[in-house]
UniProtKB/Swiss-Prot annotation:
Signal peptide region: 1-26
Subunit comment: Homodimer.
Similarity comment: family membership: Belongs to the metallophosphoesterase superfamily. Purple acid phosphatase family.
Organism: Arabidopsis thaliana
Lineage: Eukaryota, Viridiplantae, Streptophyta, Embryophyta, Tracheophyta
Pfam families (UniProt xref): fn3_PAP (PF17808), Metallophos (PF00149), Metallophos_C (PF14008), Pur_ac_phosph_N (PF16656)
Name of the protein in question: Probable inactive purple acid phosphatase 24
Residues the entry annotates as binding Fe cation: 297, 338, 341, 504
Chain sites annotated for binding substrate: 371, 502-504
Name of the encoding gene: PAP24
Keywords, alphabetical: Glycoprotein, Iron, Metal-binding, Secreted, Signal, Zinc
């Protein structure tokens, strides 16, 4: 009976935690979710004029352009707003068939891809004659701009602009690199409007100075029926295009390669992207400088100021820009969950891949699964929340490559030089006896610490330690059943660092085991491994999460600000940790680990190999 009661209490804690996190993470703050699309009424006004220019975008191959929207409205109000629609035709003719509910078909059935209040221009309320600037990316369809009055809950459609379109709306765009399953393999995934019956996708690539060669690409997509619920199946749905992945194999270590995306059309012509470059991975254990960026919960921003609501993702562009600025000193990036915060509005995935393209096209962009990618009731996720907006993992698992055995089970291991990364999936059960637990132990157990001394554990939710406000109120300082399930593995296999997102701030613990600091140093750790350092690095972009007023001894550094972590391995014995502010790029927290192979082998707290007294 006591055991049953214990299980029930654990489950209660789990689901109460999920509810708390839904509130704390601002579920529903997705800007597009504020628009009550189905309540739109037609109120066309012939005196309202809208003109968008230029009408042809990307004539020189660009995938991003600025559009000027000239507005003339003789009766401006503070509730007027512009919706940007793509495809440009957005009336009831595009409505998804439904079996019931509404007495009549609504005039609009799909969300805009972005929106902006007209009074964001200071002169709008004075004259109603202004020009707004919108940044438009290539999303495989034409674009129109619509003026609405009466706010976003019961919008009145007053007028629609002329359409604008990219010269080639189907062009290959937004390449994103990822490590393959072997160290000498790089994968390239990109988006286009070409299905395989229209064009054959491939990568043309070469080491600098050598002849180019081609590697074929596979093609995937998904449809509305792939979504698990609304808004992803309803107003948030937008055709995602096609996703192509090519595997570049047998790469030389640490060599620069040039590549471009290609599609051979059925008419015999070829569509090309511009040229990109990357540097291949070092050989596992190679002694060279290796630099890693880690952050979570970045989301996306709009450089034109649109889609601003409730300060939802205020740090996203700063983090992106700082990483781009430092890109020559970065080798690989880990974005550990809550990628876009699209929450069922599919257009946001294109906008996210466009935002991170300068990073992801140059260095491997490795991802983890978060609640905003995966969680939906009765779909196999560990949490019964609705944070994915009905996406249930499909866009993340399809649009990005990661070297998992089963893409629906978002856990994987990957090696980069002197690093071994074990990436867990906190949205699936990780407890002892589960398939994922066995993966985690295997990942930790199979690394050769002689050649790869730096062992890193990654998960989205905080399976270790955090003094975030809601964890503090629960008294757990963690995701329920997190460290209780995994700490003996971290200790046994001597995990150097464990990283988490989900909580939108920065926090670092002492080297810790069973909630006790096992080392009193703060900025330099040397000698025998004693315990794992746990780091929350979920402050990359989404609105910040407050800390608890309780500060346990194990919490060494906290920062209520946006930032990211950089790891620099100089050799097999030296690792530099830096936490940088997204706003300035300045280092706010840092420490060094100095550890030789014998220090990893040495016996310490619950991580001793059996011995015998026999001679």
């Amino acid at each position: 009976m006591a055991r049953v009661l214990g299980v029930l209490l654990c489950l209660l804690a789990l689901f109460s935690s999920s509810l708390c996190l839904d509130h704390a993470n601002g579920r529903g703050d997705q800007a597009l979710a504020q628009i009550n699309v189905y309540e739109t009424s037609l109120a066309l006004d012939s005196s309202v004029k809208l003109h968008a220019s230029p009408q042809v975008l990307g004539s020189q191959g660009e995938d991003t352009e600025w559009v000027n929207l000239a507005i003339s409205n003789p009766k401006p109000t503070s509730d007027d707003w512009i919706g940007v629609f793509s495809p440009a035709k957005f009336d009831s003719g595009n409505c998804w068939p439904t079996s019931g509910g509404k007495e009549k078909t609504p005039y609009i059935c799909s969300s805009p891809i972005k929106y902006m209040y007209c009074n964001s221009h200071p002169d709008y309320m004075k004259s109603g004659n202004v020009t707004l600037k919108f940044q438009i990316i290539n999303q495989r369809a034409d674009v129109s701009f619509a003026l609405f009055s009466n706010g976003v809950q019961e919008p009145h459609l007053l007028g629609v602009s002329n359409p604008v379109a990219f010269f080639n709306p189907k062009a290959p765009v937004y390449p994103r690199l990822a490590l393959g399953k072997n160290w000498d393999e790089m994968t390239v995934t990109w988006t286009s409007g070409y299905n395989i019956d229209e064009a054959v996708p491939f990568i043309e690539w070469s080491a600098k100075g050598l002849p180019a060669r081609r590697s074929p690409a596979g093609t995937l997509t998904f449809n509305r029926n792939s979504m698990c619920g609304n808004p992803a199946r309803g107003v948030g749905w937008r055709d995602p295009g096609f996703f192509h992945t090519s595997f570049l194999k047998e790469l030389w270590p640490n060599r620069e390669y040039i590549y471009r995306l290609g599609h051979d059309l059925v008419n015999g012509s070829t569509i090309w992207s511009k040229n990109y470059t990357f540097v291949s991975s070092p050989y596992p254990g190679q002694d060279s400088k290796q630099r890693v960026i880690i952050f979570g919960d970045m989301g996306k921003g709009e450089r034109d100021g649109s889609n601003e609501y409730n300060d939802y993702q205020p740090g996203s562009l700063n983090t992106t820009d700082q990483v781009i600025k430092d890109l020559k000193d970065i080798d690989i990036v880990f974005h550990i969950g809550d990628l876009t915060y699209s929450n069922g509005y599919l257009s946001q995935w294109d906008q996210f891949t466009a935002q991170v393209q300068p990073i992801a096209s140059t260095v491997p962009y490795m991802i983890a699964s978060g609640n905003h990618e995966r969680d939906w009731p009765d779909t196999g996720s560990f949490y019964a929340g609705t944070d994915s907006g009905g996406e249930c993992g499909v866009p993340a698992e399809t649009m990005f490559y990661f070297p998992a055995e089963n893409r629906a089970k978002f856990w994987y291991k990957t090696d980069y030089g002197m690093f071994r990364f074990c990436v867990a999936d906190s949205e699936h059960d990780w407890r002892e006896g589960t398939e994922q637990y066995k993966f985690i132990e295997n990942c930790l157990a199979t690394v050769d610490r002689k050649t790869q001394p730096w062992l890193i554990f990654i998960a989205h939710r905080v399976l270790g330690y955090s003094t975030n406000d809601w964890y503090g109120k629960e008294g757990t300082f963690e995701e329920p059943m997190g460290r209780e399930s995994l700490q003996k593995l971290w200790q046994k296999y001597k995990v150097d660092l464990a990283f988490y997102g989900h909580v939108h701030n920065y926090e670092r613990t002492c080297p810790i085991y069973e909630s006790q600091c096992v080392n009193n140093d703060k900025d330099h750790y040397s000698g025998t491994f004693k315990g794992t350092i746990h780091v929350v690095v979920g402050g990359a972009g989404s609105h910040l999460s407050p800390f608890s007023s309780l500060v346990p001894k194990w919490s060494l550094v906290r920062d209520y600000d946006f930032g990211f972590v950089k790891l620099t391995a100089s050799d097999h014995s030296s690792l530099l940790f830096e936490y940088k502010k997204s706003s300035t790029g300045q280092v706010y927290d840092s420490f060094n680990i100095s550890r030789d192979y014998r220090d990893v082998l040495a016996c310490t707290h619950d991580s001793c190999e059996p011995t015998t007294s026999a001679g």
